[in-house]
Design a protein with these regions (language model features):
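Short, basic/aromatic recognition patches
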Residues: 14
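C-terminal terminal-subdomain/extension
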Residues: 62-141
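Compact nucleic-acid interaction/catalytic patches
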Residues: 17-73
Length: 141
């Protein structure tokens, strides 16, 4: 059973490009049941990614939608030591009965709050208008 703030590894899922992805980490940001267009889910998560090297880290952290992972804010076992980031602009909706996953760690409340705030800011500025367009351009370009 996963809950808010847990870091999980999902055995397999379909990525935003529609391709199957194996063994990937996520942080749970909502653990309440709901439906989207007739499809049920019972938790929402953001994908976590590792940095390949310093150049990759610099490139990925230029995007304001990527939140760096502060390793001292994560507690658990089976963690890699690469360092990484969370994609705050991608939400994945899962049904626990339809996927295999395991909880490997949890995120402290401070980092989780920072992630939730970033998601809310991104959501607020996703609408149309010149300010939203400027922010979107800054975030995604």
């Amino acid at each position: 059973m996963c809950k808010l703030g847990d870091i999980i590894v999902v055995k397999e899922y379909f990525g935003s490009d529609g391709k199957k992805v194996n063994q990937h980490s996520f942080v749970v940001i909502n653990d309440e049941k709901d439906m989207i267009e007739g499809l049920s889910y019972d938790f929402v998560a953001n994908v976590m990614l590792s940095f390949h090297d310093k150049k990759h880290k610099t490139k990925k952290l230029k995007y304001k939608s990527n939140l760096p992972i502060k390793e001292e804010k994560i507690t658990g076992k089976d963690l890699n030591d690469k360092g990484g980031y969370i994609r705050a602009d991608e939400l994945y909706y899962f049904n626990k009965e339809k996927i295999e996953y395991k909880v490997i760690a949890y995120m402290d409340h401070e980092l989780l709050d920072e992630l939730i705030q970033l998601i809310l800011i991104l959501h607020e500025f996703r609408d149309t208008g010149p300010v939203a367009k400027e922010l979107r351009d800054e975030i995604w370009n």
